[in-house]
């Protein structure tokens, strides 16, 4: 069991024993540090708050800088909570969580924010087929079509798929296999893709399935 925060470096490929190319994602995972320990008595649940990265103290608010100072750490780029059950042993504020909490062959879930695509139409956003390319039409190639009848129901139903902001949402990719762990450089290599662009922050947790 384990949990750690990290930064997506990018994708590459590794070759397995059968000389097959395996697409992989390289993640700079940790070292993370515990900034706060949540307890049932005080907070109603048990968790560790982890921090990752290092940030100029001038660029964070004073309350947040004080929060990090209480743990004896410099301000980081990201804070996130993980359940105590995911980390073996008891940790105190200021303790380090290294990358070798995971080992090769472990299955993990990776949580991140997907790439933002901006305002997108229904063909790109919802995979609509668009209108006919012939029979006299001139401007309906990528149109959504009817979104509601005139007399009945005289309205557009809630949840109707339309154009709008695409991407930039929280996403969890489950059951990715860890192909390689490199403690000396704090890198984890997982099989497959993870959410988000390069240099985006992700959370890696052991799968419970």
UniProtKB/Swiss-Prot annotation:
Pfam families, A to Z: Ribosomal_L3 (PF00297)
GO cellular component: cytosolic large ribosomal subunit
Matches recorded under InterPro entries: Ribosomal_uL3, Ribosomal_uL3_bac/org-type, Ribosomal_uL3_CS, Transl_B-barrel_sf
Gene Ontology molecular function, alphabetical: rRNA binding; structural constituent of ribosome
Region Disordered, annotated ranges: 127-166
Domain of life: Bacteria
The keyword Ribosomal protein belongs to this UniProt entry's keyword annotation: yes
Any one GO BP annotation for this protein: translation
UniProt entry keywords in alphabetical sequence: Ribonucleoprotein, Ribosomal protein, RNA-binding, rRNA-binding
Family, similarity comment: Belongs to the universal ribosomal protein uL3 family.
Self-association state and partner proteins as the record states: Part of the 50S ribosomal subunit. Forms a cluster with proteins L14 and L19.
Annotated function: One of the primary rRNA binding proteins, it binds directly near the 3'-end of the 23S rRNA, where it nucleates assembly of the 50S subunit.
Name assigned to this protein: Large ribosomal subunit protein uL3
Classification of source organism: Bacteria, Pseudomonadati, Chlorobiota, Chlorobiia, Chlorobiales
Gene encoding the protein: rplC
